[in-house]
Each structure stands twice: as structure tokens, then as C-alpha cells.
Amino acid sequence: MEAEAAMEAEAAPAAATGAVRVEKVRGRSAVTRCFAKYPLKLIAPSKAGRASSGAAWLYAITYGGGIVSGDIISCTVAVGDGCAAAMTTQASTKVYKAVDSKCSEQVLEARVGEDALFALIPDPVTCFSMARYHQKQVFHVFPNSNLVVVDWFTSGRYESGEKWNFSFYKSINHILLEDQPLFIDSVLLEQSSNFSIADRMQEYNVVAMVILLGPKLKHIQDQMQDEVKKMMSVQLRPPTSAGGRYSTRSQPLHPQRPPIIASCSPFGRMGTGMVARITAVSTESVYSFLRHHLAALEPFLGACPYPAS
């Protein structure tokens, strides 16, 4: 076992703390390579979903349950042609207080083969007070590749009164179609002398983005777009007075904001991809949103993402 581990370490890129390869083995998607070193740990359970789905599952875990100041986690994932793989976590990724202004960093580079499916469905990132976090994710795809990306973060330990107290958060997502840019997105939150992050975010505690790309996911895209449009048309509808059009009854100057706000936008040629953006007051409301809208992935993955505990 030690000799095998040494060979894996030598084969992995020098800067990588993790490397995964998924290939077809006897008609099923299987993890044929799984290398990780501190501070990353990768677990590939043999039974994570229905066997009939033929999908491979992978759990990314950090020692101690979080990322400390100065840690750099770099992982590569290769999903072979016709394979299906899901990468998730067991709990939210905690980012601890920065020391000497050092960022905690995560970098993921994934290659999704032809007619393959890769679902990156982690729990949210939770930055503690004074934390600094930077994340970059790059996905290489083909015209018939299928990709699900959930990228989300919370305000911190808000139930304990720690709300938007981190110093810096940046997340970058790139999708390259045959090495040409297809989707580029960046989210940046940084404390300012004029307005704090808390001032700007008001009562909202969660920000999320969901990317759906590929022919196998078109029905999920369409359903999500339709349901989000209906949900927001109801939530953002101006209040009407019971007295009718000419009523003098006063309306509230500051109507209550909806507990969850979402929007959907297509991208790519012929709308082959879709991005949904969500902000919400509570983490559980986003879990419910993801659980509902991604339930249709079960036939591909053998299990529903974000199952109710």
C-alpha cells in the first residue's frame, strides 16, 4: 500500500493536493485513480447510489473540517467518455480566520468527456470572522458533455451572531468548450470603508449559483426556468389594496423582501447552458431549492443531491 501511495504521489502534478480519474469498468463508471494529500482527503464509497445508475461518487473532505489560513487545495478531476460522476462534501466547508492576511485557496480543474456527466454538488462555504478565501474552478467540456455545478456560500455562523464578518471572498468559474471560453463568472465580496458586506447584503445570509449544461440536462433547465419565473412573479408582485384601484389606503413604504430570490439565464449557443442565481435568508431554504430542482438527477447519479436529513 505504501508503494502504491508513493506512485500515486509521483504521478500527480507537483502542485496538486488531489487527483481523480473516472473511467468505464465493466460497463460502470468507476474511480480508477484517487490521490490526495494534506489538507485534502478524498473518499470514493463503493455504495453511494443505486447500482443501476452506474455512477461514481466522491466525497471531498478537509482535515479538521475546514481550511486554515494559507492552505492551498488544488484538485484535478477527469471524467471519461460516457461516464457519470458526482463530487460532494459531508458538511459545509469552513474557512478559518486569516493570519497575516493569508488567503485560504481552493482550485479545481475538471475535464468532462464526451457524453459524460459531472455533478459538483458541495455543501456551502462558510467563512468565519476575518477569513480570506479565494476559489477558482475550471471545467473543460465537449459539445455533448453534461455538467452540473453548485457554487454557494453563507454569511458565516449567523445563528451565533457572526454575519458577513469575513474580510474577503472570491469565487471564479470558467467553462471552456473545446478550449474556447463558454462561460466566465466571478463573485467578489470584500469589506469596504464606506459600506460593509453586511450593509450591502441586508437580511440575506446565503448566495448560490447553479450551472446546468448539456443535452441530458435540458429538461431540468426548462423545469427550473419555468418554476423560478412563476415563483418570482408571485413573490415580487406589488401588493394590491382591498379598496380597489382608487383606494386611498396607504401602502407600506418598505414592503417585506421575499425570503428567497432567484433568477435564471441561458448561455451558450442555442441556450445549451443555464445559470440560476439565488440569494436567501436561510441556508435551509436553499437546500430545499436545490433538493427540489436537482431531484431529476437521480436517474443519472443513483441518488438525489442534498437529501433531507
Curated annotation (Swiss-Prot):
Keyword Chaperone attributed: yes
UniProt KW keywords: Chaperone, Nickel insertion
Secretion signal span: none
Annotated function: Required for the maturation and activation of urease via the functional incorporation of the urease nickel metallocenter.
Gene Ontology MF terms: nickel cation binding
SUBUNIT field: URED, UREF and UREG may form a complex that acts as a GTP-hydrolysis-dependent molecular chaperone, activating the urease apoprotein.
UniProt similarity note: Belongs to the UreD family.
Record protein name field: Urease accessory protein D
UniProt keyword annotation of Chaperone present: yes
